[in-house]
Each structure stands twice: as structure tokens, then as C-alpha cells.
């Protein structure tokens, strides 16, 4: 079933840092199963701001056994929704919340102990915190190490919660704060999470090559750098999992070229969309994406970031051909299987059929 919105009541809004809040929601019993999540997934929130429909995706920061549905929102410059959330949302408000999505997930647990590593920067901690809480609660023999980059100690989101986990699980949870604008006693922990910093940290402090899984989350530049360092250390690419919060400047967007390199996307077309078992046809104007065509036609197709990162708009091309401009979230196997990000896809053929229900 495709993700869908429901109005949920805000249970609590907690100030985490000067520019970040966590928001928890009340989930009625009738929707409990719909909002059951896996650690690492995200919610898409929707609100009308200055007369415009604005939606943004935020990672769930609770563990699977915590009994709560909670996200964190960091205020960003020019961010309409992040400013709205930090300044206006209060306990008792109702907000449209899409059911959980995302495949930035923990590998299946097969028993015994495993060693996991996460590298996060800024608000990239949010899905990672949920993973850490889940593993520590469910896997008594497993270890989790976190390298967490921030500007200053005051800007660390969930600082107290992370320290509490360290005290609760000594020997199983290791946290290393790396600060770019504050000098720390350990020189290795002062500065940016760049290649010069990550290489010794992942060699001598956290033996990444021995990890059963490595999770990267935050700005694209950090993720690309960390991925390159891990590859250089010989970490199996299949064990590296990425969640982009912003694309890296100049980084490759992993989108395939259309089968016909000279394919014309600047022509009108027709798109048939399969959503929750129903079929609806929408006209697509020249140069228009599938998502924009659906919005213009008043069709409630899943989408959020419209930047090729969150994967909410994922669908499978059943008939015809599209050109996907950028892709920061689909795995290679998904692209091979015909899945696309409809916020980045424009019809190449006169008619296309896309299935949002395909798994």
C-alpha cells in the first residue's frame, strides 16, 4: 500500500537545542499498525504555510520498542517547514503525518553479537539514534559505535540522551563527538569529519573494517567523503548504508540515462498511475515531472522532498519509458528493476504507466 496521510495530534514538543525541536505524536489504536516503523525510517509532515501546501520528511528518532512516534526538526536557513515547526507547533495541535517510509534500515538480525558503526553529522543523528536504541534494547551481545560531528557542544542534538545511553550500556555503546568549532582535549576529535579526520578514527578508534554494518547520515559531502574513506580501508560496499539529508556539491546523482540518449522529454504525454490499487490517468505537460503533473491534476500521489533524496515518490515503470534526472536514494537493484523517483522523472514515450504499489 502506498504511504498516506492521517491527522495526528502532537503529544509533546521538546526543545533539544537552540535551533532544533523533537515532536512526538499520539497514534490512535485504529492506526497503530499503519504507523508501526522500522528504525531508520522517516515521516513526512504536511502543513499549510502562508497559503502553500508544504511537506517535508523527518527521520524517526525513537527506537522500535520505545512506544512513541517522534521526529526531530532542525531549523535551516530558508526552510519554511523547519521554521514553522520550531516556532509554531505546540502540544495539542493536529498535523498531517504520512505513514512511515524509507529503506535506511538495520540489516536483519540473525542472533549472536554484531558490531555496528554510524557516522552522523548535525541532524543526521535522528535515524541513527533510533537504530542505536533498537539494537541496544534488542541485541544484548551487539555493540554500536557512533562518530558524531557537530560545530559545538551546544549544537549537539540529543546530547543528554546519548550520554544516558553510554552510561546505561557501558562496553556496548561508544560515542565520539567530533567538534569543528571547539577545541577538545583529544586532538583527533577536533575539526571537521573530512578524510584526514575520518581515516585515523576509522582505523585506530573504531575498526570500521570489522563492522557488520556502517551507517552514514547527514550532509551529502560528509557521506561521500566517509564512503570513499571506508572503501579505501577495504570495507565491503554492501555493508555501507547511506541516507542523504542534502546532496553533495558536485556529487554524482546516480540516475540512469534513458535507453535512447537523444530521447525527447520536452513533449506532452499521458501517465497512468497505480496508487492503492486504483488507476488514474493524468496529462503531463512538456518538461513536467510525474509528481508535478499529479499535483496539477489534483491526484494525491506520494511525494515529499522533490529533490531525489527521500524516496517517498518511488514507483515502478510498468509501461513506457521515463528519464530520471537525479537519484540519491534508490539502490542499484531498484533502478535495474525499473523503479524511479517520480519527482525526478519525465516521460520519454507518449504514454507511461507507473505503479506506486510495487514493492
Question: Which residues are covered by each model-predicted region?
Answer:
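Residue-level marker of beta-strand positions
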Residues: 42, 68, 93-94, 289, ...
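C-terminal accessory/binding modules appended to enzymatic or scaffolding proteins
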Residues: 266-309
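Ligand-binding loop in jelly-roll beta-barrel domains
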Residues: 64-67, 109-114, 139, 347-356
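Iron-sulfur (Fe-S) cluster-binding segments and ferredoxin-like electron-carrier domains
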Residues: 280, 293-297, 302, 312-359
Amino acid at each position: 500500500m502506498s504511504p498516506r496521510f492521517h491527522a495526528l495530534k502532537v503529544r509533546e514538543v521538546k526543545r533539544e537545542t537552540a535551533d532544533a525541536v523533537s515532536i512526538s505524536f499520539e497514534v490512535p489504536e485504529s492506526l497503530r499498525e499503519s504507523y508501526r516503523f522500522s528504525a531508520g525510517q522517516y515521516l513526512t509532515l504536511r502543513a499549510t504555510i502562508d497559503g502553500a501546501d508544504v511537506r517535508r520528511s523527518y527521520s524517526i528518532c525513537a527506537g522500535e520498542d520505545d512506544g512513541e512516534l517522534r521526529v526531530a526538526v532542525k531549523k535551516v536557513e530558508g526552510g519554511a517547514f523547519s521554521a514553522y515547526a520550531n516556532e509554531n507547533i505546540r502540544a495539542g495541535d493536529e498535523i498531517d503525518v504520512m505513514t512511515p517510509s524509507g529503506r535506511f534500515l538495520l540489516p536483519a538480525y540473525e542472533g549472536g553479537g554484531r558490531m555496528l558503526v554510524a557516522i552522523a553529522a548535525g541532524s543526521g543523528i535522528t535515524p541513527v539514534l533510533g537504530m542505536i536504541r533498537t539494537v541496544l534494547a534488542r541485541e544484548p551481545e551487539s555493540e554500536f559505535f557512533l562518530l558524531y560531528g557537530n560545530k559545538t557542544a551546544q549544537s549537539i542534538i540529543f546530547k543528554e540522551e546519548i550520554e544516558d545511553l553510554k552510561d546505561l550500556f557501558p562496553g556496548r555503546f561508544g560515542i565520539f563527538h567530533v567538534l569543528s568549532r571547539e577545541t577538545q582535549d583529544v586532538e583527533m576529535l577536533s575539526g571537521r569529519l573530512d578524510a584526514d579526520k575520518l581515516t585515523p578514527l576509522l582505523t585506530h578508534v573504531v575498526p570500521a573494517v570489522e563492522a557488520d554494518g556502517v551507517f552514514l547520515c547527514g550532509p551529502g559531502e560528509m557521506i561521500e567523503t566517509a564512503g570513499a574513506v571506508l572503501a579505501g580501508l577495504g570495507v565491503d560496499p554492501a555493508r555501507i548504508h547511506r541516507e542523504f539529508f542534502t546532496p553533495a556539491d558536485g556529487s554524482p546523482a546516480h540516475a540512469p540515462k534513458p535507453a535512447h540518449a537523444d530521447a525527447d522529454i520536452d513533449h506532452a504525454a499521458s501517465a497512468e498511475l497505480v496508487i492503492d490499487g486504483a488507476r488514474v490517468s493524468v496529462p503531463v505537460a512538456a518538461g513536467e515531472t510525474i509528481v508535478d503533473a499529479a499535483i496539477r491534476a489534483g491526484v494525491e500521489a506520494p511525494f515529499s522532498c522533490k529533490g531525489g533524496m527521500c524516496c517517498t515518490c518511488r514507483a515502478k515503470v510498468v509501461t513506457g519509458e521515463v528519464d530520471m534526472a537525479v537519484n540519491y536514494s534508490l539502490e542499484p537493484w531498484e533502478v535495474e528493476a525499473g523503479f524511479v523517483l517520480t519527482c525526478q522523472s519525465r516521460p520519454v514515450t507518449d504514454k507511461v504507466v507507473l505503479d506506486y504499489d510495487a514493492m
